[in-house]
Amino acid sequence: MSFSSLNFEIKESHKLFISPFDRGFIFGDAVYEMILCIDGRCIFLEDHLARLKQSLASIKLIPDFKEKNLEDEINRIANVNDAPFQAIYVQISRGVQLIRNHLPEENLSPTVFITSIKIDDPSDRHKGISALLKDDERWLKTDIKSTSLLANVLNKIEADSEGHDEVILHKGGFLNEGSVSNLFLFINDDLHTPSLDANILPGVTRAKLINLAEANNINVIQRIIPLSEIDNAQEVFMSSTTKGVIPVVRIIGSKFDTDKPGDLTLRLREIYLQEIYQT
């Protein structure tokens, strides 16, 4: 049995109902966060809440609740579901508007939905994934964690249909990120990642990995990375909230092809796992 929260009321998940006139349903007029929880502890919660706050500000959605109330409700959902490994999904839409109109009515009450998704232990050893290079066809405001994810869905469908796990997106000859992850490359033992002005989401895990790498004497370079450089990368990995460090062993559309995750990637992965288990 799972429990979710709708507008700060917790019920069994199957007993919750959202209006079909909610702007999140009609327009995708909503933002979200995904938070890793281990044994009831929400990892990097403050960072996720800060990004959620920024997303809300970017779409000019003013919450009618206190941030502390949201934080408390997230923790309640994590604890009431009592699973060792969870992803807590938080979605806030602009609210219910009975007459469909692109222009929001004034004084709408946001819809706040929080649920728990059971996930695998992030420490499960990962053999590495296969990724597909693809032109980035998403909208330009990728810094907003919007629920309007149709382009991402289509990317995942395409990758899966061709037997791959993820898509690595590029635009105008430069690397961006994955469809649901950030991108890292080891080049000459330095860790390279597309900078935030490369049309990417400011990933919480990405930021933590940069800090951890620097603290462990790994030189990190954030820059605009030409697509061609992926051919000569020593190692490639992706990062996400629920999976942490995801080694990439093959990239279709490039010369990058290896038989196993690289040592530098695995070292950083272990450092990251130590961080999340002691946070």
Question: Where are each of the predicted segments found?
Answer:
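Helix-start/capping segments and mature chain N-termini
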Residues: M1-R76, V80, L98, H102-T279
